[in-house]
Amino acid sequence: EYLDELDEKRPIASIHEIPAIDRFIFAMDSYIDMYVNHKALLQFNDNFNHFVSHAGTDSEMLNDFKSSLYSADARFLKMYEKAKEDHTFRTDIPFEEFMRETVHVMMAACTYYANGFIWGADENENYVSELKRIKGMIVAYVRNKEP
């Protein structure tokens, strides 16, 4: 449902109208939005990932789950391909590596904050400003081509 709401805000058909960096920033902001408004979704995803990685599930058992990710995966790949055309962010590293170093890092940070698994955290504290700073570092990395 959450991804469907995002689809309404930024339809996949609009990929050619929006610079890749703006799509990327939208994705980063979406994770922060999940932290603010849908912490349970981030927590569920974390618990699900833990379960899947430790329960000994086979690939066939995860087919429905993998199918549900198709829309998001397609969006990220189209965003990356668009960046190759408009040069609004780095594409000098392979797509899979780019995703791990950027999108997955942001998702992991938001998940850890949602779970309260951060050093020195106060319960019920709002850490949006810190997540925005992390987002800023990631965006600077993808724009500046710095390691």
Please provide the spans of the model-predicted regions.
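N-terminal alpha-helical segment
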Residues: 6-7, 76
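Hydrophobic alpha-helical connector segments
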Residues: 11-41, 95-102, 131
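Hydrophobic packing residues in well-ordered alpha-helices of helical domains and bundles
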Residues: 24, 62-65, 69, 99, ...
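Short secondary-structure transition hinges
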Residues: 33-75, 96-97
